[in-house]
């Protein structure tokens, strides 16, 4: 059975924190690949102004293109409406019955697991991998695999705010992503 990690998110924008998490879990669990799963409309962010799918996908491609063990999975982008992890993983497990999926989540999402849509059935489809993020504990009633990662306190919301305030984002996200953001005027106030 193949072992593949899945890291979902809006990736608005993708940054070195996403890449660090994916790479650390890849090595810690001896995965074959890590698939980045950009969300269409995540239920917990419904109503927030999210950058276009096309721009987020382009930035994600730029961020991951140099790592041969990173791929982009378009499963959620092909659907309309809110993206529920259960629905996505049900489709992926049907398409790839030879794969054991490891769904990678940060500490904030570990604490939120009891509120996830159809969590009990989702646990039959994936192994959850919780990574330590600053300020969060990994306490949950559900079985998760824990991976320790070096502390790197950057988030997409922090980057959007820094761009809005015209502060530098150098060394926080890949240079190609930074150039794309600046050329396309993303995150300006």
Swiss-Prot record:
Gene Ontology biological-process entries: NAD biosynthetic process
Q: Which keywords, in A-to-Z order, does the entry hold?
A: ATP-binding, NAD, Nucleotide-binding, Nucleotidyltransferase, Pyridine nucleotide biosynthesis, Transferase
**Recorded GO MF terms:** ATP binding; nicotinate-nucleotide adenylyltransferase activity
- Stated EC number for the protein is 2.7.7.18
Pathway entry: Cofactor biosynthesis; NAD(+) biosynthesis; deamido-NAD(+) from nicotinate D-ribonucleotide: step 1/1
The reactions it catalyses are: nicotinate beta-D-ribonucleotide + ATP + H(+) = deamido-NAD(+) + diphosphate
Q: Does the keyword ATP-binding apply?
A: yes
SUPFAM superfamilies linked to this entry: Nucleotidylyl transferase
A family per Pfam: CTP_transf_like
Q: Which cysteines are joined by disulfide bonds?
A: none
What domain of life is recorded for the organism?
A: Bacteria
Family per UniProt?
Answer: Belongs to the NadD family.
Give a short account of what the protein does.
Catalyzes the reversible adenylation of nicotinate mononucleotide (NaMN) to nicotinic acid adenine dinucleotide (NaAD).
Protein name, per record:
Probable nicotinate-nucleotide adenylyltransferase
Q: Which organism is it from?
A: Bacillus cereus (strain AH187)
Q: What is the lineage of its organism?
A: Bacteria, Bacillati, Bacillota, Bacilli, Bacillales
The gene that this protein is the product of is nadD
